[in-house]
Amino acid sequence: MAADVVGDVYVLVEHPFEYTGKDGRRVAIRPNERYRLLRRSTEHWWHVRREPGGRPFYLPAQYVRELPALGNPAAAAPPGPHPSPAAPEPLAYDYRFVSAAATAGPDGAPEESGGRASSLCGPAQRGAATQRSSLAPGLPACLYLRPAAPVRPAQSLNDLACAAVSPPAGLLGSSGSFKACSVAGSWVCPRPLARSDSENVYEVIQDLHVPPPEESAEQVDDPPEPVYANIERQPRATSPGAAAAPLPSPVWETHTDAGTGRPYYYNPDTGVTTWESPFEAAEGAASPATSPASVDSHVSLETEWGQYWDEESRRVFFYNPLTGETAWEDEAENEPEEELEMQPGLSPGSPGDPRPPTPETDYPESLTSYPEEDYSPVGSFGEPGPTSPLTTPPGWSCHVSQDKQMLYTNHFTQEQWVRLEDPHGKPYFYNPEDSSVRWELPQVPVPAPRSIHKSSQDGDTPAQASPPEEKVPAELDEVGSWEEVSPATAAVRTKTLDKAGVLHRTKTADKGKRLRKKHWSASWTVLEGGVLTFFKDSKTSAAGGLRQPSKFSTPEYTVELRGATLSWAPKDKSSRKNVLELRSRDGSEYLIQHDSEAIISTWHKAIAQGIQELSAELPPEESESSRVDFGSSERLGSWQEKEEDARPNAAAPALGPVGLESDLSKVRHKLRKFLQRRPTLQSLREKGYIKDQVFGCALAALCERERSRVPRFVQQCIRAVEARGLDIDGLYRISGNLATIQKLRYKVDHDERLDLDDGRWEDVHVITGALKLFFRELPEPLFPFSHFRQFIAAIKLQDQARRSRCVRDLVRSLPAPNHDTLRMLFQHLCRVIEHGEQNRMSVQSVAIVFGPTLLRPEVEETSMPMTMVFQNQVVELILQQCADIFPPH
């Protein structure tokens, strides 16, 4: 049964747990994390969120425990399976011997640490400490600040054998005995067992001067050596009076290593041994540096910061379980160096804290939908999370690449910049595309913040909130109210996600070109920063798209609202209801539709508001000038005229009939000036800007331009066909690939250097098809229109000799370019016919192929079949009498 929460109630995680929600979001909780309780949904699941500004989610109720008021110091105690008893119980000790030959140096002195912390540990232990966050999330490695303390000098570790050591005050419930070790040993403090707060485990290190017990006789040949491990000191709940009492200052002793001669320092109270001098932090002891987040109580909160390892970004970060704050290692570099406490590791046989059973269901059965905040724009205003420790400018998204580099991606241009650092540690940005370097990321034009739409679960029912003039809404709490932050903070955190949801859309025109068919499809649509983006995949998590639209999916269409127009589509555009028509500045048109009239109305209002605000940012003259100049590389007059036109005569409204009429008149004025200054086609041809194409050009003009008697393309085709062989079956009868022929045609029209030996034109039928296409697209056929009737009349003559003589005289009367081209073509066709046995091309076959191409009437006649017969007979006669009609020179 769901129960409301009264007041600010917080819960503390006692056991780790991970799950994937129904929306695809992965949720993971770790011990010592604190969350704010929003609602006790069921007995198994509670609704919580991280403070401050995190998105709400569900966690198992048995894995957490409620915390009392924040003022109670006991709330900072770590979780435990049982409450602490009133009186301490007798201590239970677990003795075991650990062999770690690789831990100590050759003389028994501690190995030198190369990490950031100055404590000692062997290579094996250093590797274990690095992966501690993934192996044991409940035992993070904590960093401690050690204040300066007086030092009792000593000459070697042998002096420590005679010294009496007392356990540190407040660490154990009762006193215990310690063993004195030789130079190869160390002073080790007992560690409590995990069974209860009053039970302790003493890990005793073997003393080389004491004979081993009988049960460990097999270890005599391999004497054990001390083991050092970096283990977190778990904080304990204390009374208010004890918390206010000052901590006793530890005593440090100075010793000299016999092997290396280096001085090292030993603390008999804590058993810590270190190479680094503890006096370096003496100056900061009066006011020690706090954790990455400034807190009031240095003693209680300073040591609560744990060090963890992020597997995704491969970086070290810090986490405070009491405040729920996280920080990267970069933010703590300026603090004084801290030291890891050295204590023996837990016994492998010690029992662990049992976890409660897994809840029965993934989500409360009483809730059939996700929280309202999941689809609201709260993600766009959240604090930077662990994946983005630095402040990301508006319009940019930050992520870590596979090369472990910080990549910043522009939401609008998809431009990527890499964050690097110079030798002095100062960050700068590098663009791999143009090799440019900048100290700061390029600024993205972001419109002024306006009323934020808080969407419902489907992102389509916004509720407007009017922010104050001096403050900008930044966060949404659990009931949907706005938290207000200062303008300085809002300038860094505010982004411009206006609306998001699933819409039906189709594209009807692409840059002014009308598309034939409309393909309606549902897609996730995001309105952000004056840009409307339609994504391809609408099944991906909507919440992820709200946070990072560029990573959410591949954008299919991106429409810039600057200069766009929006209206309700008429019935002739679409038979659907609730259809919007959006026209962009580049001439593209889109239809947007939703079945709900309320939802489409909110989209209409949001898009129209974005268009109006973007139009108000620029002067009307500049907007119109950008519309006219779009896609044109020519200027519309001199710069003086530009400046004169750009002067604002009157502030015309962006909308309304008066503004539209004024805009149309300005457009007509611009077009009139453009047409008046437009050069003529003849002048462009004279200057060489425009050249006539080869295909479709008049034969006489082409020969004159190429200064040849036969077109160059005809000569190249004939030579290429004869070079590849005239014995190919179906030569000139079989058609080549039409797409390849069109590519060859484009190559001939736009490139003067044509190489038919290129591999793209290896098919001889492509070349023969291109040659036939050239003759077919001549404005006037090779037999001119003026000679058509004469050739038909000559072929109808019954006398064969007279018919041949008439045809010969007509051919010789043709213009020189036509006559010479006919000569070369028919002599080539005669050579093709000579190989008729191989290529199966007879005189009749060639005449049928070339008859309608070379000889056709200017106006189609009714007796088309008879005309085609006569055309073929004319070509057949010329082929049979080619030597007589075209005698050799």
From Swiss-Prot:
The keyword Oxidoreductase does not apply. SMART domains: PH, RhoGAP, WW. Residues 383-395 have a biased composition (Low complexity). CDD domains: PH_ARHGAP9-like, RhoGAP_ARHGAP27_15_12_9, SH3_ARHGAP27, WW. Keywords: Cytoplasm, Endocytosis, GTPase activation, Membrane, Phosphoprotein, Repeat, SH3 domain. The record marks R733 as: Arginine finger. Interacts with SH3KBP1/CIN85. This is Rho GTPase-activating protein 27. It comes from Homo sapiens (Human).
